[in-house]
């Protein structure tokens, strides 16, 4: 049973013994033990993960796995990887910790657990799509800004991202440009 205005956005299968991180648009996050979220029937509401400030909402959650780190991407196109150890385990339903300084660097668009051998695909409000290897994004402790992972304008913003397996491009950009210009690189 969901309250009016609520929605189910993410589902993940786990072993029941992990830490979970939930992050919000206003830059807060909470890390809690999965075992703190008690088992309930399928018609129940569930349990509160994080206490939200007025107007704030959840932008993502991640299961802390050994070979992954947490990627945070802002609407202004900045991103950073952080170790899950940077997030102190708390009791669920609290206010959490500052994950990202949104007043300075923009609101959080999404978070995702990532591995170094993966890529992320980001999409902006204006429909611009960019693919970036995770290993090219620097790691910083929270609440650092990170590095530019997607250029946005004042009128545009990052709205979503997906994590995909890394794939080498079929044709290099240099080869493509040389072919288009009959060998004359521009």
Regions found by a protein language model. Give the residues of each.
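Intrinsically disordered, low-complexity regulatory segments
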Residues: 1-173
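Conserved small/polar residues in nucleotide/adenosyl-binding loops
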Residues: 174-181
């Amino acid at each position: 049973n969901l309250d009016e205005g609520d929605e189910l956005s993410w589902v993940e299968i786990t072993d029941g013994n992990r830490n979970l991180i939930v992050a919000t648009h206003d830059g807060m996050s909470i890390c809690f033990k999965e075992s703190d979220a008690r088992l309930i029937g399928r018609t129940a509401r569930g349990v509160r993960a994080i206490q939200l400030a007025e107007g704030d909402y959840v932008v993502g959650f991640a299961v802390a796995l050994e070979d992954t780190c947490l990627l945070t991407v802002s609407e202004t196109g900045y991103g950073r990887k952080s170790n899950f150890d940077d997030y102190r385990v708390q009791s669920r339903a609290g206010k959490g910790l500052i994950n990202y300084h949104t007043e300075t660097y923009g609101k959080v668009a999404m978070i995702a657990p990532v591995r170094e051998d993966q890529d992320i695909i980001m999409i902006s409000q204006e429909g611009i799509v960019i693919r970036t290897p995770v290993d090219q994004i620097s790691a910083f402790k929270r609440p650092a800004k990170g590095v530019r992972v997607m250029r946005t304008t004042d009128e545009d913003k990052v709205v979503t991202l997906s994590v995909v397996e890394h794939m080498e491009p079929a044709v290099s950009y240099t080869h493509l440009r040389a072919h288009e210009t009959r060998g004359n690189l521009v």
